[in-house]
């Protein structure tokens, strides 16, 4: 009897986990009318918070462009020796490292603490702290990151970041607030496990009012007889009674109150005191790190091949073949040698999707990293199955976007530090200025697909000559030239144009 019961329990657990993972994928539909965009604008951050060891800048999530795409975006600058406090959010995040290097920890619930201190490390602890009951430190895996990395953070999973380099870390993060993993609302929310941070997406004036209101409530509670003391901080422990926390952690009440960070004014990025942050981690050179990344990708390809074989054999994929605790969360798309598309005189494009980074199947997000050389052109194209949020990394580009009515909804310059949302199916073209143009695009599909309008792999090339000639009312010779004159597929070298310079002059006058 025991075996059938155990089998039944196992099947129930597999079905439950499979259902949970299935629920985490997919996106909610935006409210009706939110994508009726008559004009797009290249946006700068609208909110800025200065912390002890860095700066947090965010774009207004209520802007119609972000409401259409169902996303929120924040840019963080972490100074050397700066620590972004542990936090989790109500929506999955995809983060791109613009500059710098550092380490991060992602805290999956129930996963073992596989990084632990040695006896030698314990001997370095001050004698006053050593005792028979003293525990060696151990924690979950530490991951290194560097410029060009895409990092995936699932919804509700806590994480932290630390800058162990000599230059600031600049990171841009997109939160997919319409993902089914978010069952609250479309407002981006960060839940901190420490400190007294501000709401990154709320204007400063509103934050000051909210902080004043919390302080008044805190003072009123202190004056009420029999009222348990609660902190006035802004992390998840602040609202609990200190006595409850003391019981939960088995510590004294004073230590429990420190969790509430009542008088901490450092905000969400703090400076590590003294020397660098001391955590348990392997010391790798860049070459060793890249070698380990290649091994991880090879293991994932083997796992993916096994999954395909199991599905052909009639077995369902329950999402557990790659253990959650060992998920690879990072992929570098900034390295030129990693390019998926390359044209010698025009530029390159690299992508991260669920084929190259399987965790993105869970997040339902992907990313594109592009570089256009001076005056090069990314041919007109559209995204078949995703919105695209473009962040300009370096340089400038002339960008045009056209909607389903054939109306130009954006015809302007996109500069370093700006964001532009390109809705699904809207056609777009980019042309770099003299200094070139580099960007990263966050896309709201695990395998975002692009369809070019010109070039060797374009929709126009795929049409029969007769169809093209009759549709455009042109001779077949002209139709043939439209189909075959451009042999490149995606990135092309642009030819000089007097009309382009005159258009730029008119825009400058406006």
From Swiss-Prot:
GO biological process, one term: seed maturation
Tissue spec. comment: Expressed in endosperm of the seed.
Keyword field: Allergen, Disulfide bond, Seed storage protein, Signal, Storage protein
Signal peptide: 1-23
Disulfide bonds: 35-68, 111-325
Positions with biased composition (Basic and acidic residues): 284-318
Record domain Cupin type-1: where: 38-257, 331-480
A GO cellular-component term linked to this record: extraorganismal space
InterPro entries recorded: 11S_seedstore_CS, 11S_seedstore_pln, Cupin_1, RmlC-like_jellyroll, RmlC_Cupin_sf, Seed_Storage-Functional
Any Pfam family matching the protein: Cupin_1
Highest taxon, organism lineage: Eukaryota
Short motif (NGXEET): ranges: 318-323
Modification(s) after translation: Proteolytically processed from a single precursor to produce an acidic and a basic chain that are linked by a disulfide bond.
Ranges for region Disordered: 194-239, 284-319, 487-510
Subunit structure: Homohexamer. Can assemble in other multimeric configurations.
Role according to the record: Seed storage protein.
Family the entry assigns: Belongs to the 11S seed storage protein (globulins) family.
Protein name: 11S globulin
Biological source species: Juglans nigra
């Amino acid at each position: 009897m025991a075996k059938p019961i155990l089998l039944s329990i196992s099947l129930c657990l597999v079905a439950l986990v499979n259902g949970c993972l299935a629920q985490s994928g997919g996106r909610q539909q935006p409210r009706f009318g939110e994508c009726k965009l008559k004009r797009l604008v290249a946006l700068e951050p609208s909110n800025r918070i200065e912390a002890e060891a860095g700066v947090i800048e965010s774009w207004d999530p209520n802007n119609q462009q972000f409401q259409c795409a169902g996303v929120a975006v924040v840019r963080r600058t972490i100074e050397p020796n700066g620590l972004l406090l542990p936090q989790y959010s109500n929506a999955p995040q995809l983060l791109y490292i613009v500059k710098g290097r550092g380490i991060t920890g992602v805290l999956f619930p129930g996963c073992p603490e596989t990084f632990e201190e040695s006896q030698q490390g314990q001997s370095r602890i001050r004698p006053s702290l050593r005792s028979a009951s003293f525990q060696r430190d151990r924690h979950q895996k530490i991951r290194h990151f560097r410029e060009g990395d895409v990092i995936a953070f699932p919804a509700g999973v806590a994480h932290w970041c630390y800058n162990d380099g000599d230059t600031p870390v600049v990171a841009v993060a997109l939160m997919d607030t319409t993902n089914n993993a978010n069952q609250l609302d479309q407002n981006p929310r960060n839940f901190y496990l420490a400190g007294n941070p501000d709401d990154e997406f709320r204007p400063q004036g509103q934050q000051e009012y909210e902080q004043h209101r919390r302080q008044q409530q805190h003072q009123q509670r202190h004056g009420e007889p029999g009222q348990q003391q609660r902190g006035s901080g802004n992390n998840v422990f602040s609202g609990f009674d200190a006595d409850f926390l003391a019981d939960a952690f088995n510590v004294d009440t004073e230590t429990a109150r420190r969790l509430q960070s009542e008088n901490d004014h450092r905000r969400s990025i703090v400076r590590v005191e003294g020397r660098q942050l001391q955590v348990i981690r392997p010391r790798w050179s860049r070459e060793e790190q890249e070698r380990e990344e290649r091994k991880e990708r090879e293991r994932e390809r083997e796992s993916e091949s096994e999954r395909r074989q199991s599905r052909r054999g009639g077995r369902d994929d329950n999402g557990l073949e790659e253990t959650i605790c060992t998920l690879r969360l990072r992929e570098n798309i900034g390295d030129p040698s990693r390019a998926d598309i390359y044209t010698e005189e025009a530029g390159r494009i690299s992508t991260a999707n669920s084929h190259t980074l399987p965790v993105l199947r869970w997040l339902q997000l992907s990313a594109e990293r592009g570089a256009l050389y001076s005056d090069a052109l990314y041919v007109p194209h559209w995204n078949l199955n995703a919105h695209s949020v473009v962040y300009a990394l370096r340089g400038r580009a002339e960008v045009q976007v056209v909607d389903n009515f054939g109306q130009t909804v954006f015809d302007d310059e996109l500069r370093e530090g700006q964001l532009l949302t390109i809705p699904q199916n809207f056609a777009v073209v980019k042309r770099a200025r003299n200094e070139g143009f580099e960007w990263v695009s966050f896309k709201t599909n695990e395998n975002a697909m692009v369809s070019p309008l010109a070039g060797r792999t374009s929709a126009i090339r795929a049409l029969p000559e007769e169809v093209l000639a009759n549709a455009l009312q042109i001779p077949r010779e002209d139709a043939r030239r439209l189909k075959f004159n451009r042999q490149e597929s995606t990135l092309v070298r642009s030819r000089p144009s007097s009309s382009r310079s005159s258009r730029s002059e008119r825009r400058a006058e406006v």
